[in-house]
């Protein structure tokens, strides 16, 4: 798997920003088939940082109402919380 396809996008929520400021942890949406070793290698290669640990979570898609009677579902996705070493930082577009 190509490392550019492992990390899809960062998650920028209030909780994710607090984790970044307090614990130096960054949250990403990643490919569902990626494991922790692949995620660690992708983050270290793409952002030139040293990763201390990776925690992953499979998130189940919620049910939606599509039309008047039909039900649909959002896609399942995978979340990765990456902790960096001291002095490491990833420049995201959070200063816009």
Swiss-Prot record:
Signal peptide range: none
Q: Which GO terms describe its cellular component?
A: ribonucleoprotein complex; ribosome
**One GO MF term, please?**
rRNA binding
| Disulphide bridges, residue numbers | none
GO biological-process terms attached to the record = translation
Sorted alphabetically, which keywords does the UniProt record give? Answer: Ribonucleoprotein, Ribosomal protein, RNA-binding, rRNA-binding
Could you name the domain of life of the organism this protein comes from?
Bacteria
InterPro entries, per database record: Nucleotide-bd_a/b_plait_sf, Ribosomal_uL23-like, Ribosomal_uL23/eL15/eS24_sf
> Does the record carry Ribonucleoprotein as a key word?
yes
Return the similarity comment. Belongs to the universal ribosomal protein uL23 family.
Main role? One of the early assembly proteins it binds 23S rRNA. One of the proteins that surrounds the polypeptide exit tunnel on the outside of the ribosome. Forms the main docking site for trigger factor binding to the ribosome.
Which NCBIfam families does this entry report, sorted A to Z? PRK05738.1-3, PRK05738.2-4
Q: How does it assemble?
A: Part of the 50S ribosomal subunit. Contacts protein L29, and trigger factor when it is bound to the ribosome.
Protein's name in the database: Large ribosomal subunit protein uL23
Organism lineage reads as: Bacteria, Pseudomonadati, Elusimicrobiota, Endomicrobiia, Endomicrobiales
| Name of the gene this protein is made from | rplW
